[in-house]
UniProtKB/Swiss-Prot annotation:
Gene Ontology MF term list: structural constituent of ribosome
Organism: Ligilactobacillus salivarius (strain UCC118) (Lactobacillus salivarius)
Pfam families: Ribosomal_L30 (PF00327)
SUPFAM superfamilies xref list: Ribosomal protein L30p/L7e (SSF55129)
Alphabetic keyword roster: Ribonucleoprotein, Ribosomal protein
Keyword Ribosomal protein: yes
GO cellular component, one term: cytosolic large ribosomal subunit
Gene that produces this protein: rpmD
CDD domains tied to this protein: Ribosomal_L30
The protein's name: Large ribosomal subunit protein uL30
Domain of life: Bacteria
HAMAP family for this protein: Ribosomal_uL30_B
Assigned protein family: Belongs to the universal ribosomal protein uL30 family.
Amino acid sequence: MDKLKVTLIRSVIGRPQNQRDIVKGLGLGRVNSSVVVPDNAAMRGAIRKINHLVDVELAK
């Protein structure tokens, strides 16, 4: 199964609580922190809700 590398590129300051919860749930903390997650429907749905805050690329 493929994996996605998700990098937080914008701060969650001033964002709604549901977006903050998604960022925290993915394991992202500070700006420029990255995490590798499985490429499945649940992760893609979470990433879609915060796509303006993160950068996503295929992990090698």
